[in-house]
């Protein structure tokens, strides 16, 4: 994991003759053994150098979404030549086949006796399962690569300077090999939703194309140099994939009796499932428009 500290990204910036590198890369303080982390027997700790005159933002706007797209595309581009064997921080984190396996196991066990209520929803999800598991299948066929991705893309995981310019990507604990769909799709799952992820009124849930266009423009500007034609072609698929995946995860937990996600009320995971599945449907309807816009950027 040390390669993602002050050495790997910093060296890339030096080769690119970047200035102000100390503010554009998180620098981790090494231990006396030379490691960039310390294990106290129970937990891991890291200390990074404070970056002065920096701030995080929470607001998701077309302007901030464009900047996020540029920076995370740049982040992937700088790490594109690193070996995939870097290691998975969370195994199968964004593996759709694995998430479907979890759902099917939950359905078979029906631990909380809730299957009668959700059987029709499970059937709907299963109809699209083969299509939504395409990434893993294409990877096994050698048609789709895995790259080093951040895997937690959001506005608050970047530092900005006092003038609103992007300094660096932060919160690197989920950085690992994945499909580029992880960074592209997961950002738009949250940022492109016009409502909270647990909105009970499904009529309030729509997919925000203005956020999509801004993020896609920034991302493709900085990532198109290394993306394959298939990766670019499948970016709209990524936008569908992540609300679908999250719906599957919420539903599996609901069927299991709410054992994983913290809930605020008895039907919370069920409400979350319906909300994410509605967002998936909205994203699917927007795919032709997404494809047309991405083509215009190339």
Task: Give the ranges of each region predicted by the language model.
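Structural motif at the C-terminus of the N-lobe alphaC helix and the adjacent alphaC-beta4 loop
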Residues: 11-23, 78
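Single conserved hydrophobic/aromatic residue that forms the stacking wall/gate
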Residues: 2-13
